[in-house]
Regions:
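HIT superfamily nucleotide-processing domains
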Residues: 1-96
């Protein structure tokens, strides 16, 4: 659904919301704690990609949530940094 030279975005195979998309860097970074200061432009780019995809999915006006999990207690299950984009319904706070 989105790809450029630094990132790609695709639908989650086990969605937790009507819109549940993963935005991932092409660079191998295990998790947010492993990102280096040199990765700051890439991390910002992931957020920009998420906003672009949210507009494409038509959820920009109603709202969406971005999540990065770190560690098992947070629900991290894939050892590659990724941003979850959730939307398409009202999202409760606090989550979980």
């Amino acid at each position: 659904m989105y790809e450029d030279d630094r990132a790609l975005a695709f639908r989650d195979i086990n969605p937790k919301a009507p819109v549940h998309i993963l935005v991932i860097p092409k660079k191998e970074i295990a998790n947010v704690a492993e990102a280096a200061s040199a990765d700051e432009p890439l991390l910002g780019h992931l957020l920009t990609v998420a906003a672009t995809v949210a507009r494409q999915e038509g959820i920009d006006d109603t709202g969406y949530r971005l999540v990065i999990n770190k560690g098992p207690d947070a629900g991290e299950s894939v050892p590659h940094l990724h941003v979850h984009l959730f939307g398409g319904r009202s999202l409760a706070w606090p989550p979980g």
